[in-house]
Design a protein with these regions (language model features):
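A glycine- and small-residue-enriched flexible loop/hinge signal that marks low-structured segments
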Residues: 1-165, 204-206
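Extended, compositionally biased non-globular segments
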Residues: 151-207
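C-terminal edge-of-domain segments
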Residues: 208-212
Length: 212
């Protein structure tokens, strides 16, 4: 999670998101009141460095389960009473079209309010990956990472063990494939039970070269 200096939200680049950037999320929000706002306006901050809401985002992530979106209104209020952007501009003073562009095209993270709902919340849980990527949101990345770690934990003891080959096809024997898939599925079964997955299926390619 990265928090850059925002010199002007109206001139903030909105063409930085793209493929293969799922490990990056960019926070351009900060508080428009309280200590954060005072620090931003202080004469000691002559360079007008943003006093980012990065800490708030990290706090929400630490509280959220891997599959939960930090923009979930019911669960994750930010505690920021007056949302602003990193140049000190209040979110409420910014044109809605620009906010939409920063959100959907720029894929930035910042704080927003909702009509009829007290408090402020995250606009979304974007990564800087493509919006149509399987890894377009932080929770998608975190969930997949947990699945991979879990599978590795269960499968690692099988390394160096016997694998059997079908004498006719030269491919992995069906019972070897079934065994490895059953072992790997244990991690995903636990995640599904905990509500972190909607479903799962491990597939082991029987045609892979295991003897070379």
């Amino acid at each position: 999670v990265y928090a850059p200096k925002v010199s002007s939200v109206k001139q903030q680049a909105v063409n930085l998101a793209g493929a293969n950037q799922s490990r990056v999320s960019v926070v351009i929000g900060q508080t428009g009141s309280g200590t954060g706002a005072e620090l931003y306006k202080d004469k000691g901050n002559a360079a007008k460095a943003s006093v980012s809401g990065l800490g708030v985002v990290l706090g929400l992530l630490s509280r959220a389960k891997v599959h939960q979106c930090i923009a979930w209104i019911k669960e994750f209020p930010t505690g920021v009473s007056l949302p602003a952007f990193g140049d000190g501009t209040l979110v409420r003073d910014v044109d809605k079209a620009l906010i939409e562009t920063l959100d959907t095209t720029g894929r930035y993270l910042f704080f927003v309010t909702h009509t009829g709902q007290a408090g402020s919340y995250m606009n979304d849980s974007h990564t800087m990956d493509s919006g149509i990527s399987d890894y377009a949101t932080i929770e998608s990345v975190r969930t997949m990472d947990k699945a991979v770690r879990g599978i590795r934990t269960y499968v690692k003891p099988e390394l160096g063990g016997n694998v059997y080959v079908d004498p006719t096809t030269g491919q992995l024997a069906s019972y070897t494939v079934a065994h490895l898939e059953t072992v790997a599925n244990q991690a995903l079964e636990a995640m599904e039970r905990d509500g972190e997955l909607s479903g799962y299926k491990v597939e082991v390619d029987p045609a892979q070269h295991v003897a070379s």
